[in-house]
Amino acid sequence: MADTLVKNFQNSPLGAGGKLDLLAIGVHPDDVELGCSGTIINEIKNGKKAGVLDLTQGELGSRGSVETRYEEAAKAAMIMGVSVRENLKMRDGFFQNDEEHQRKLIVAIRKYQPEVVITNALSDRHPDHGRAAKLTTDSCFLSGLRKVETKDEKGDQQEPWRPKYIFHYIQDRYHEPDFIIDISDVFEQRMEAIKAYTTQFYNPENEDDGPQTYISTSAFLDSIVARARVIGKKIGVQYGEGFNTEKSLGIKNLDSLVTIET
């Protein structure tokens, strides 16, 4: 069954399609898991429908292969419980924020019609991350313009769609979060989704997957846990995920705030 899922994922979206409440976008497979998988799992447990869109296949990665990345991404998708995962197969390292790539992303945005999009950090150690963030924000805006015409896989004209919110998860370079989501109850599941990428992150059983990299050490996984603790502490919880937004957020009343014991 796993082989069938991977083959389906390589050629078409994994899982069922349809409108999503939340679409998480990452330029590389594993970006979403590292940045916002706890929030995805939380939202799904609260009855929301979520999906993942990978922009590239991560083919320039030093460890693993395209095939193993698909297998790992499919496993992580099942752990998170997302309804769909699709890969747009843009060129890792060389994609651009231009009309060609914007139109490709607009087709996906209009296909899934998400209310909320969560995507890469606005700037980061890896230049792909910031470029993907700008590509996503520009494409989300253009997707709402009626005169930007696109067609779906069947050749039918797509309707314009603009997500209500775009949020950016925090990656390697620390950004002070604009808001924080409590992921304490799902933290172990989040780490399980991250560790599904056995060729990318520390795994003593997978020592033959290529040279040691910045993210393949045990220290990197330790830093992921530490980051979640530090962010969670800011709102008085055990673990948190932080996000940045370019649009002001509002709440209906003060009861919506997380209580911090002092």
Residue ranges, per PLM feature:
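Active-site rim/loop-helix segments in enzyme catalytic domains that contact anionic ligands
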Residues: 1-112, 244, 256-261
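Metal-dependent de-N-acetylase/amidase catalytic core
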Residues: 2-23, 99-262
